[in-house]
Every structure is written in C-alpha cells, then in structure tokens.
Amino acid sequence: MIRACKLIQAMTVALLLAAIGWGTSCSEVKHINAEVAYQTEAQLGEGAIWHPDRGTLLWVDIEGRTLYEFMPEKKKCRSWKFDRRVTTVVPETDHTVVLALENSIIRFDLNTREKTEITPIDTKGGRLRCNDGKCSPNGWLWVGTMSLDEKSSEATLYCVRPTGRIDAMVRGVTISNGIVWSSNKKYIYYNDTPTGHIRRFRYNLHSGDIIMNGIAVDIPEGTGLPDGMAIDRNDNLWVAQWGGFGVYCYNAYTGELIAKVEVPAPNVTSCAFGGEHMDVLYITTAREGLTPDELAAYPLSGCVFSCRPGAVGVPPNYFGQESNQQEE
C-alpha cells in the first residue's frame, strides 16, 4: 500500500530530521509541541472540524465507523456508531450535521439520530469509498473519494449542493484529502495524498467552477504525505502529514515551511482550528498502518491532540449556509 510503504521511509527521515534540525533553514522554522486532548485508540481518526454553535470538536474514526463529539471543557466525548464507514462531518445547524458515509452523503440529527440521505456516491462497485470533505463559503459540500487499493486513479472530488445536485470537479484522483478555501474565496487548496504536493485551483464563488492554478506546496521529501488540512486567517496552510509525526505549516503563496507541530504519533491525519477564539489547533491521529512494535513505541497513536500554535483559524462553513465573511 502506498501509505504503508511511504511510512517506513518517512519515519526514518523524520526521526533523522528531528535529531539534526532542518538544515540551513532550521532556525526559521517554529516548533510547537502538541499535547493529548483526548486519549483514545482510534484506528483511523479523521475529519476534525469545530462546531461553533455547540463549542465542540467533531471528528470520526473511519474504520471504527464512529462519529465523535469532543467537549473540551468536560474532557469527554459523545459518540454515534454507524453500520458503514463514516469519513467526513460538517455542521449544518446547531443539532444537525452532514456526513459522508462510505457510499453516500446523509443528514444526521445529533439529538434524534435520524438519518436522511442527500445523495448516493459512485464507488465503482466498491473499489472506492468517500474520504475527506468540507463546505465551501456558499455552503456546498466538497467531498472526495479514494481508491481502496491506494493506487488506482479512479477517485473523484465532488461538489454536493443542498438540493442534492452532485457535480464531478476533479477526476483521476487516488486519495482525495484536505480541501480549504483562501480568505478572499478565490482559491481552493487540495491534496491528492500520494502526489506529495498541494494543488491550488482558481475558484468561482458563484458558479463553483475551478481552474488548476499550479502547485502551492511541494511536501519536503521524507516528511510524510499530505492528509487533512486547515487554513488560518493569514492563509497559511496547516497540513497533517501521514508518516510525518506532525502538522506542518506552509505559506500558501511561497510554499515555504513556517512551523511544525510535533505530534508523538507517526500517522497524523487531520487538523482543525477551534476553541472560543479559534486559536486552538486540534489534531487527529491513527493506529492503522503501524506494526505492533511501532504501536509499542508510539502508544499515543489514535489519540486527539491539541496545541496553541500562535495562529487563529477561520470558522467552518456550514452546509446550506453562505459564509458571512465578505469576499475581498
């Protein structure tokens, strides 16, 4: 598997880099330590997103088929179990969310547990499943699929509107991940994990059309692969890197590495800003892909971590609601 093979190389190089620094630019890179926010053993923790109305962090364990709601003040989690993999969660109202299950998009009521299908997703006869997703500033869900063999390029990035209309936006994808929008709403940043870089697309807020605008970031060799992603108010990209022991912060305009959040787990999967002032970075991790020896060496794998990195994030967009942040 792509991620498993890359992990061995990435872990070796990441440990070496941690020991010797970052070469000529090491003094310019800020290092921040993450701490455990919630101790658990998620097989594939993913999809971290803050719910401002509830003051909680939502996230999923894809292989555990479970949606979680972490309440920071109580240090406790609520959970909801599903009969299929649950891969993405975005807020809709103060009590409903929209979820990507492995082969469909549904509305889910956190109070009543009522489920309503919005649209099915083409999984090519089970060769694909849904993966990461987020809502655009105009309230449309952008969600991608991934190839279960992590090799073929059959997957697609879709745009799902509240009406149920679904459009294919990017084809030829292997593992769709980490989509965010710039503060001026004119650009999308997007990861197809095995490529090892972050793509930039020109974005039309009104039509939803996108045009490839180049590579924003080439992930440094040996630091893992780009997974989930968040963006701060200064348009810096905070990228969870599978096999990279951390979240890496890049300048979206220059591609320069600015900071690294050190996480004591190899497989870092997603991140999201949250908290009352949107200044806490929450981070999910995974136990999947690790050998028994690696799990013994990194026993906190699967936990949710957090830190205050000195940056402020932007609130998430809600499904079906247009962002009140003004286009520049």
Regions found by a protein language model. Give the residues of each.
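Bacterial Sec-dependent signal peptides at the C-terminal "C-region" and cleavage site
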Residues: 12-30
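A short beta-strand motif characteristic of beta-propeller blades
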Residues: 33-39, 75-81, 116-123, 165-171, ...
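Beta-rich, blade/repeat-based domains predominating
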Residues: 40-54, 83-100, 124-140, 169-187, ...
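Conserved beta-strand positions in repeat-built beta-propeller and related beta-rich domains
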Residues: 51-52, 57-62, 98-103, 143-151, ...
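A short loop-to-beta-strand structural motif that recurs across blades of beta-propeller domains
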Residues: 66-68, 104-106, 155-158, 197-199, ...
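Hydrophobic alpha-helical segments and helix pairs
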Residues: 114-171
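Short loop/turn segments immediately following beta-strands, especially the blade-tip
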Residues: 201-209, 309-314
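Blade-level signature of beta-propeller repeat domains, shared across WD40, Kelch, NHL, RCC1
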Residues: 274-328
